Amino acid sequence: MAQENLQKIVDSLESSRAEREELYKWFHQHPEMSMQEHETSKRIAEELEKLGLEPQNIGVTGQVAVIKNGEGPSVAFRADFDALPITENTGLDYSADPELGMMHACGHDLHTTALLGAVRALVENKDLWSGTFIAVHQPGEEGGGGARHMVDDGLAEKIAAPDVCFAQHVFNEDPAFGYVFTPGRFLTAASNWRIHIHGEGGHGSRPHLTKDPIVVAASIITKLQTIVSREVDPNEVAVVTVGSIEGGKSTNSIPYTVTLGVNTRASNDELSEYVQNAIKRIVIAECQAAGIEQEPEFEYLDSVPAVINDEDLTEQLMAQFREFFGEDQAVEIPPLSGSEDYPFIPNAWGVPSVMWGWSGFAAGSDAPGNHTDKFAPELPDALERGTQAILVAAAPWLMK
């Protein structure tokens, strides 16, 4: 009976397909940067209110709606909705205006529309399920600390903890329009820093009267690469990237300060902490070795924990997806090196969680990837598969 009711709800999506596609195109044409998604947040709230729901504004621009439908388990689902500072080059007739210099290059518009579509299907078919569904629309995933903002704004206090929490992400993955799962670690922990090295500037012809921060920075950049190659177990995953270096504007002047932009990735939170401490140790030591008296400054930007999927829950979901979509449509893949702030949400509630990926392209992994100017999940399949997945994941807990 549960699978029959699930199928009925999924079938009901057909009647709203055209409206949902138009909604997706609106989100796509109105990209907004992290924690500045005011129009997007307003539109999400309006769509939820049309369904008779009362969304709560949590976490600056975040929106949360609770659908209470009798007794039963509770399922939460999170979708993000911020864009990226990339000029769109997809050629779509619903492309974002290039003059904006922004686009939905990571599919968050698709995540949002899929969740709104699933909520609509649940509201319109309350006779087929029982329990509670929590729709968490999260801002600022792209380095804006959106999940942390929602937690700091009292998400776990304002919204009762669900039994399980889910999230998904669209990728250019194989199989085409299929789903990928990873029991255990799915995504890495990450941190971002700016490190300011304060030397003593002066004329380029008299370096002996200076403490050259550029030379020190060069030594630091080289030494940082030994953290992964000589301090981290080869069976673990860690990356240290110096993504930017800023210092000086003149060819014959030694600057007073050099700033390094540093990013780390690690397969677990403990290793992430170790790598960050190793960076500090090396930077301090190199500055001391160069005779620089002023201590370096470590400007923390943000960090996220690793996405660790509950293994039993992941196996359960894979079985559920294979039963509904077909054996070849839900595959297990190795962990990915990307990162997400999603874990802050289930961690705040203290509930088991799973995040999975789904393919938005007929070409699978040959399609343009996330964070490129040609990233454009294909309608209608990408949207339908994303919407269906939310309902299929929630079914074991909610379907009558």
From Swiss-Prot:
Classification via InterPro entries: Amidohydrolase (IPR017439), Bact_exopeptidase_dim_dom (IPR036264), Peptidase_M20 (IPR002933), Peptidase_M20_dimer (IPR011650)
Class of enzymatic activity (EC top level): hydrolase
Documented applications: The elucidation of the enzymatic mechanisms of malodor formation may lead to completely new ways to design deodorant actives. A targeted approach to block the enzymatic process offers the possibility of an efficient treatment without perturbation of the resident skin microflora. The enzyme could also be fed with alternative substrates which are designed to release a fragrance note instead of the malodor.
Domain of life the protein comes from: Bacteria
Transmembrane feature ranges: none
Cofactor: Zn(2+)
Coiled-coil portions: none
Catalytic activity line of the entry: an N(2)-acyl-L-glutamine + H2O = a carboxylate + L-glutamine; N(2)-[(2E)-3-methylhex-2-enoyl]-L-glutaminate + H2O = (2E)-3-methylhex-2-enoate + L-glutamine; N(2)-(3-hydroxy-3-methylhexanoyl)-L-glutaminate + H2O = 3-hydroxy-3-methylhexanoate + L-glutamine
Keywords: Hydrolase
GO MF annotation, one: hydrolase activity
Family (UniProt): Belongs to the peptidase M20 family.
Name of the protein described by the UniProt record: N(alpha)-acyl-glutamine aminoacylase
Organism: Corynebacterium striatum
